[in-house]
């Protein structure tokens, strides 16, 4: 599920770069309202399936449960708004999707680091996987090095910090609430906050949305509506550090999408970067701890 999420996000980088000609908040507002429109029927569809299977469905009836769901949507939505806005602003200033993909994916390191402050101790296996993933990300995305740290780079690094908070918020709330409803409320929050920011700081026009119709639709329906819902559902029973590792595959899928769909050739360095990231994800999933326990009990 998170692998599919990474694929959708990876291909969305091209769409975001194509939409960098319009205001960052306007772009985010458009894609978020589209996500809301997609998620409303999705909630009803999930309810219908659950009803058929005899499982609990519908909105929470108890006040504490409703409060938890609303709090979850507000917290996750606010972090997602801030992270997505920072990402789009960074891409608008410097449309280098490669650098944006690398700097954004630094959440792969930040999530386990922040987890230490919450008492989550990562295994040596996990930390080795992180180092391999960062090396792979650098080889894949940074063909000519950093070329000096620019303003857009600091904005994209702040985006990685904010995405780390969003991932950890999802980790906290997803076992407590319905995932699809959390996704819906999260995007209502993002849509309202980004619309307010667009009206204050920008001048959105219908002509602007018409000129960027396809990027907004793809990011709204696929990246926001589908991708972030898959993230919530996929993270439900997974260590957030491992989840962040799997999701950093978005950089690999971004490069592979360009190769397959746009005819952009992958160099040996980029191919090696893809292989390292994939190896890091596989390494993080290998059950070394279980094998050691089995050997001890044998």
Where are these regions (language model features)?
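Glycine-/small-residue-enriched transmembrane alpha-helix faces in small-molecule transporters
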Residues: 1-30, 39, 78, 82, ...
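Hydrophobic alpha-helical transmembrane segments of multi-pass integral membrane proteins
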Residues: 1, 26-46, 71, 75, ...
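Helix-helix packing/entry segments at the starts of transmembrane helices
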Residues: 6, 30, 100-106, 170-191, ...
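Hydrophobic/aromatic residues within transmembrane alpha-helices
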Residues: 19, 27, 31, 90, ...
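Hydrophobic transmembrane alpha-helices of multi-pass small-molecule transport proteins
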Residues: 39, 122-142, 194, 248, ...
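Hydrophobic/small/kink-forming positions within alpha-helical transmembrane segments
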Residues: 10, 14, 40, 77, ...
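C-terminal transmembrane-helix exit sites in multi-pass transporters
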Residues: 38-43, 107-128, 252-272
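Specific transmembrane alpha-helical segments of multi-pass solute transporters/efflux pumps
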Residues: 12, 47-52, 57-103, 139, ...
């Amino acid at each position: 599920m998170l692998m599919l999420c990474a694929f959708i996000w990876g291909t969305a980088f091209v769409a975001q770069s194509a939409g960098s000609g319009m205001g960052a908040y306007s772009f985010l507002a458009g894609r978020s309202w589209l996500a809301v429109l997609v998620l409303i029927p999705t909630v009803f569809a999930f309810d219908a399936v659950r009803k058929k299977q005899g499982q609990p469905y519908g909105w929470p009836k108890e006040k504490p449960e409703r409060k938890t769901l609303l709090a979850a949507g507000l917290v996750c939505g606010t972090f997602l708004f801030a992270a997505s806005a920072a990402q789009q602003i960074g891409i608008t200033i410097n449309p280098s999707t490669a650098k944006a993909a690398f700097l954004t994916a630094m959440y792969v390191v930040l999530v386990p680091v922040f987890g230490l402050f919450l008492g989550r101790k990562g295994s040596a296996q996990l930390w080795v996987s992180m180092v391999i993933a960062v090396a792979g990300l650098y080889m894949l995305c940074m063909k000519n090095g950093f070329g000096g740290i620019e303003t857009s780079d600091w904005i994209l690094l702040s985006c990685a910090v904010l995405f780390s908070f969003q991932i950890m918020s999802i980790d906290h709330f997803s076992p407590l609430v319905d995932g699809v409803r959390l996704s819906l409320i999260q995007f209502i929050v993002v849509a309202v906050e980004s619309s307010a920011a667009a009206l204050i700081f920008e001048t959105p026009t219908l002509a602007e949305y018409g000129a960027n119709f396809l990027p907004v639709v793809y990011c709204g329906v696929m990246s926001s509506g589908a991708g972030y819902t898959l993230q919530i559902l996929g993270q439900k029973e997974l260590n957030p550090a491992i989840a962040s590792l799997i999701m950093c595959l978005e950089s690999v899928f971004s490069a592979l999408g360009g190769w397959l769909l746009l005819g952009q050739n992958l160099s040996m360095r980029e191919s090696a970067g893809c292989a390292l990231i994939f190896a890091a994800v596989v390494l993080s999933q290998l059950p070394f701890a279980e094998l050691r326990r089995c050997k001890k009990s044998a």
